[in-house]
């Protein structure tokens, strides 16, 4: 059975660890330097992304979760860039700025998709006062349901045992992405997520599945761990828990471009899923699906709920369900090439009712494929006012995707879907209500491309607003 995505807006996660800024310079290489036998890169584009523990926080935020991050930085420009980028993503930053250290920064120079060199600007944080982080943890722990300790061996987790005990005393599970071969320092953690090389550095070479399981359980006992998740690259993942059978997950990656940040994605999706109420095995299945997405991207990357839903339930390959705009455009082209008539409609669909279902069934009967474009939460709020939507974008899309009449569900953030419709160009655009075809957003573009626009009637007596008022009034 495929796992169901939880409501990540309920997931509060505290991240403590080594924060860093990843910088990228891109450009073509057309000649060799006369000064040394190295290529000359003409830098045409630059990019800055939060990395390390900060990338974990970004992953939590991209899922719609509430991320609170504690880390060590310098008092410098990269620290400001890092804080501004995270804050813009609604990550709560609680950095300890130390004057004698630089903020860890990694600069990568790339040309034609290939990394030519990486330059590191860093000094390991040493002999820091544990209380600087412990006091911040104490304030944050009552607001979260999971803690991630993200260790890149840069010094932020110098006092990691104290951090583990602080979280455990508060009754909050601790998930750790380990670094190095000294797992004694992680004693008592709820879950460790070593990759295969990190695992073998501690237990020795593993020659079989049985040996992996035996050595994994021995590790759990030795270091008093709650569970162990070994990420195994092309062999997927193996989850080991006390008193339970091993849980193996095959890899879901189709193409691997870059493994940078994949471990961050695994632990962030896993912890956020547990914080949102998922059992550990389901959370691991979701993390495995997310890893399959992120290794297909270049550089440190995040996974959105749309991409995660696609990976879990299918869209590009299975050709149905929640889908991204780019994937939808591709799917529509393929469908139209097969001679299928594609119908498209849009709306908020905040509380799905009988009128919506009747309308969508009617729309589906007019063609071979039905697309439903859904206003995002911010778009609904602008259109409907405070208190709306009642249901989040992900929930509304999940319900629509479950209807037999609907083939694809795609979000849009603007007030109208005109841009999206112009990009998709369905054969038939339909809209419910009292409209003139020429006044429907996207209608002119569809007609200009040879398509049609049609207005359908809504079922009388069905209204989301009336349902909300009835609930407020206590009527059934």
UniProtKB/Swiss-Prot annotation:
<comment type="pathway">
    <text>Nucleotide-sugar biosynthesis; ADP-L-glycero-beta-D-manno-heptose biosynthesis; ADP-L-glycero-beta-D-manno-heptose from D-glycero-beta-D-manno-heptose 7-phosphate: step 1/4.</text>
</comment>
<dbReference type="Pfam" id="PF00294">
    <property type="entry name" value="PfkB"/>
</dbReference>
<keyword id="KW-0808">Transferase</keyword>
<comment type="subunit">
    <text>Homodimer.</text>
</comment>
<feature type="region of interest" description="Cytidylyltransferase">
    <location>
        <begin position="344"/>
        <end position="476"/>
    </location>
</feature>
<dbReference type="InterPro" id="IPR002173">
    <property type="entry name" value="Carboh/pur_kinase_PfkB_CS"/>
</dbReference>
<feature type="region of interest" description="Ribokinase">
    <location>
        <begin position="1"/>
        <end position="318"/>
    </location>
</feature>
<keyword id="KW-0511">Multifunctional enzyme</keyword>
<dbReference type="InterPro" id="IPR011611">
    <property type="entry name" value="PfkB_dom"/>
</dbReference>
<dbReference type="GO" id="GO:0033786">
    <property type="term" value="F:heptose-1-phosphate adenylyltransferase activity"/>
</dbReference>
<dbReference type="GO" id="GO:0097171">
    <property type="term" value="P:ADP-L-glycero-beta-D-manno-heptose biosynthetic process"/>
</dbReference>
<dbReference type="InterPro" id="IPR011914">
    <property type="entry name" value="RfaE_dom_II"/>
</dbReference>
<keyword id="KW-0548">Nucleotidyltransferase</keyword>
<dbReference type="InterPro" id="IPR014729">
    <property type="entry name" value="Rossmann-like_a/b/a_fold"/>
</dbReference>
<comment type="function">
    <text>Catalyzes the ADP transfer from ATP to D-glycero-beta-D-manno-heptose 1-phosphate, yielding ADP-D-glycero-beta-D-manno-heptose.</text>
</comment>
<dbReference type="GO" id="GO:0005829">
    <property type="term" value="C:cytosol"/>
</dbReference>
<dbReference type="InterPro" id="IPR011913">
    <property type="entry name" value="RfaE_dom_I"/>
</dbReference>
<comment type="pathway">
    <text>Nucleotide-sugar biosynthesis; ADP-L-glycero-beta-D-manno-heptose biosynthesis; ADP-L-glycero-beta-D-manno-heptose from D-glycero-beta-D-manno-heptose 7-phosphate: step 3/4.</text>
</comment>
<keyword id="KW-0067">ATP-binding</keyword>
<dbReference type="InterPro" id="IPR004821">
    <property type="entry name" value="Cyt_trans-like"/>
</dbReference>
<dbReference type="GO" id="GO:0016773">
    <property type="term" value="F:phosphotransferase activity, alcohol group as acceptor"/>
</dbReference>
<dbReference type="Pfam" id="PF01467">
    <property type="entry name" value="CTP_transf_like"/>
</dbReference>
<dbReference type="GO" id="GO:0005524">
    <property type="term" value="F:ATP binding"/>
</dbReference>
<comment type="similarity">
    <text>In the N-terminal section; belongs to the carbohydrate kinase PfkB family.</text>
</comment>
<dbReference type="InterPro" id="IPR023030">
    <property type="entry name" value="Bifunc_HldE"/>
</dbReference>
<protein>
    <recommendedName>
        <fullName>Bifunctional protein HldE</fullName>
        <ecNumber>2.7.1.167</ecNumber>
        <ecNumber>2.7.7.70</ecNumber>
    </recommendedName>
</protein>
<keyword id="KW-0119">Carbohydrate metabolism</keyword>
<feature type="binding site">
    <location>
        <begin position="195"/>
        <end position="198"/>
    </location>
    <ligand>
        <name>ATP</name>
    </ligand>
</feature>
<dbReference type="InterPro" id="IPR029056">
    <property type="entry name" value="Ribokinase-like"/>
</dbReference>
<keyword id="KW-0418">Kinase</keyword>
<comment type="similarity">
    <text>In the C-terminal section; belongs to the cytidylyltransferase family.</text>
</comment>
<dbReference type="GO" id="GO:0033785">
    <property type="term" value="F:heptose 7-phosphate kinase activity"/>
</dbReference>
<feature type="active site">
    <location>
        <position position="264"/>
    </location>
</feature>
<keyword id="KW-0547">Nucleotide-binding</keyword>
